[in-house]
């Protein structure tokens, strides 16, 4: 967060705060559902997304209300992102992408995007590249757009999926932007992919790394880089450390049981 604190949400509903030295702070909170996303807005308020229990902004909860077209489109909130203009984007798993728009009473209404297909409504992750383009990982592939353009026209985005032949997978689990600005995509079943937009984002070049290249498992849960430029790739069966310079993997297991190696 902006003050250096680290916020950790758990699947048992705990929200814990640590300082930069990993010392616990007495601001722990508990929810009645899994916490899947945490972000901070420009006012310093915490946005917390849950599985099945909606979105909390500061002290206010937002839920799906079928009779209100400006309410949250789904109560499963898996991703929250603050863009370069401090706009807050919310990814729901079932209702697509949301733009939170402030109202005169200090609360929010929600504008809905990516309602076209069932898979596009399943949003897991939101990330921004070095050009200010936003990448959204869904169950229908990768949607890439410029925020200003999408707000002006809800159909102004680029979709790269297995279905349309522009990517190796539909199921996008995670997106990571490394220190060199490169975009790495983790998929469910198609491993790790280094993606490079071409032709003004009309096409996507990707380099694939799967089990045949040394990755421990092709179902990726998360990606994180270290200070040496390595990528740590958490999968459904172990963790891989990937060196982008040598294209080599080192694999790690921490349990003799299969379920103990799911990350």
Question: Over which residues does each language-model region extend?
Answer:
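Carboxylate-rich, polar loop motifs that coordinate divalent cations or form catalytic acidic clusters
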Residues: 1-263
């Amino acid at each position: 967060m902006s003050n250096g604190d680290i916020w950790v949400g758990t699947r048992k509903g705990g929200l814990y705060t640590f300082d930069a030295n990993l010392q616990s702070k007495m601001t722990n909170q508990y929810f009645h559902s899994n916490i899947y996303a945490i972000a901070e807005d420009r006012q310093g308020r915490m946005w917390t997304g849950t599985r099945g229990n909606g979105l909390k902004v500061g002290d206010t909860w937002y839920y799906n209300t079928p009779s209100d077209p400006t309410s949250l489109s789904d109560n499963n909130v898996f991703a929250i992102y603050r863009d370069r203009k401090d706009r807050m984007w919310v990814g729901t798993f079932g209702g697509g992408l949301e733009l939170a728009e402030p109202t005169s009473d200090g609360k929010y209404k929600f504008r809905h995007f990516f309602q076209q297909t069932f898979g596009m409504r399943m949003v897991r992750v939101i990330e921004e590249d070095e050009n200010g383009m936003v990448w959204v990982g869904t169950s229908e592939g990768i949607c890439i757009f410029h925020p200003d353009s999408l707000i002006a026209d809800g159909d102004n985005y680029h979709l790269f999926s297995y279905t349309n032949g522009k990517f190796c997978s539909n199921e996008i689990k995670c997106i990571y932007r490394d220190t060199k600005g490169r975009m790495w995509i983790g998929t469910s079943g198609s491993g790790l992919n280094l993606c490079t937009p071409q032709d003004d984002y009309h096409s996507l070049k990707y380099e694939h790394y799967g089990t045949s290249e040394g990755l421990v498992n092709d179902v990726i849960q998360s990606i994180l880089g270290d200070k040496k430029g390595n990528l740590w790739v958490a999968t459904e069966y172990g963790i891989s450390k990937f060196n982008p310079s040598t294209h080599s993997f080192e694999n790690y297991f921490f349990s003799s049981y299969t379920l103990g190696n799911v990350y």
